Amino acid sequence: MQFDVTIEIPKGQRNKYEVDHKTGRVRLDRYLYTPMAYPTDYGFIEDTLGEDGDPLDALVLLPEPLFPGVLVEARPVGMFRMVDEHGGDDKVLCVPVNDHRWDHIHGIIDVPTFELDAIKHFFVHYKDLEPGKFVKAADWVGRDEAEAEVQRSVERFKAGGH
């Protein structure tokens, strides 16, 4: 399975950008309240609709941060299942397709534990200081579950659009 991911937030940022799906422009949503930065490039999978009503979120492992709006052809290796104040907010963990440095990463088991722990720590705590926001459940699942969620999100998009 391969798909395009639109990067919204580069690794290392505290600015939370979002693509305005009506205009196609990148908008500053907020500056994170917690003194933490995004641990990977963050964006969404094109032509999907997640459980939260937004395109399905994606995390892309890259050696250098990209710019908001850049498309990356990616493949899933796992997924971070997360529930926040709006409900399900899963994030598909991906690697770029056309970069042989990632050929050895086939599933979540191949991603270094420290990397997974750092990503989990960020998403469990990044809303801690924001009034009315929270994360109440979060854990990693494998590639098969990630691919199934991508497929469900594609079907939701086709049924309802965005």
From Swiss-Prot:
Show the Pfam families listed in the entry.
Pyrophosphatase (PF00719)
Catalysed reaction, written as an equation? diphosphate + H2O = 2 phosphate + H(+)
UniProt-annotated catalytic positions: 89
Q: Where does Mg(2+) 1 bind?
A: 52, 57, 89
Q: Which InterPro entries match?
A: Pyrophosphatase (IPR008162), Pyrophosphatase_sf (IPR036649)
Q: Which GO terms describe its cellular component?
A: cytoplasm
Sequence positions that bind Mg(2+) 3: 84, 89
Query: Can you say where in the cell this protein is located?
Result: Cytoplasm
Q: Which cofactor does it need?
A: Mg(2+)
Enzyme Commission number(s) of this protein: 3.6.1.1
Q: Which family does it belong to?
A: Belongs to the PPase family.
Q: How does it assemble?
A: Homohexamer.
Name of this chain's protein:
Inorganic pyrophosphatase
